[in-house]
């Protein structure tokens, strides 16, 4: 019979998320290490620079910082890879309030049936490219591409307390970029949704 008591001398169960505090501090922008690094790196010349740690991307200092792992991050080139590689090394995550953008091509199956595979692949790549540029411009991160869908996330560390407004602005910008703001038909039929709430963000 399980009494719920731990046998004397037995070890406690390991913490399933030992890095939660670190993740939370980084995701909500309160991590002291980033604050110290930013204080040092912002004095190095070389615009543009990482929006999180202020590492320069341009000039001689930018070349040096690239050698140190501070090259632009592919998922959002306004930030450096070093700011996110740390999280890759420490598996875990934290529940934080964040905003998400979901965008997909409406009627993609019918659309694909009406063109060659190469033409549809080109159209899909164009959609991905536009979505990435819109997310980057509004302090979002590309969370993932799933078929004809793009998912973006807006966290406090990057978009600050305005992450819901940033997600909404990105949604509007994506609709405009795909031609939904004019009198004619859009070059790509896209649907966009935004949600804000507490979510587990991590690896």
Q: What are these model-derived regions, one by one?
A:
Residues 34-142, 146:
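Juxtacatalytic helix/coil linker segments
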Residues 28, 89, 180-183:
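Charged, solvent-exposed alpha-helical segments that act as regulatory interaction surfaces
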Residues 134-166, 177-203:
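Catalytic core of nucleotidyl cyclases, primarily class III adenylyl/guanylyl cyclases
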Residues 40, 100-106, 171-186:
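Hydrophobic transmembrane alpha-helix bundles
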Residues 1-51:
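A broadly conserved sequence feature marking short terminus-proximal activation segments
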Residues 123, 127, 166-170, 174:
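Hydrophobic alpha-helical membrane-association signature
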């Amino acid at each position: 019979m399980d009494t719920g008591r731990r046998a004397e001398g037995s070890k406690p169960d390991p913490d399933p998320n030992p890095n939660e505090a670190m993740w939370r501090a980084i995701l909500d922008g309160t991590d002291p290490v980033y604050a110290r690094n930013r204080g040092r790196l912002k004095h190095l010349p070389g615009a543009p620079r990482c929006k999180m740690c202020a590492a320069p991307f341009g000039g001689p200092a930018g070349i040096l910082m690239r050698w140190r792992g501070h090259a632009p991050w592919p998922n959002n080139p306004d930030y450096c890879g070093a700011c996110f590689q740390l999280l890759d090394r420490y598996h875990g995550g934290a529940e934080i309030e964040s905003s998400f953008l979901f965008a997909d091509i409406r009627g993609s199956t019918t659309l694909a049936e009406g063109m060659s595979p190469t033409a549809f692949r080109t159209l899909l790549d164009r959609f991905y490219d536009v979505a990435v540029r819109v997310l980057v411009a509004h302090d979002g991160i590309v969370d993932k591409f799933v078929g004809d869908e793009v998912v973006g996330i807006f966290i406090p560390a990057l978009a600050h307390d305005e992450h819901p407004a940033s997600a909404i602005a990105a949604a509007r910008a994506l609709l405009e970029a795909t031609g939904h703001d004019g009198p004619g038909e859009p070059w790509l039929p896209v649907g966009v949704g935004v949600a804000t709430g507490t979510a587990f963000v991590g690896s």
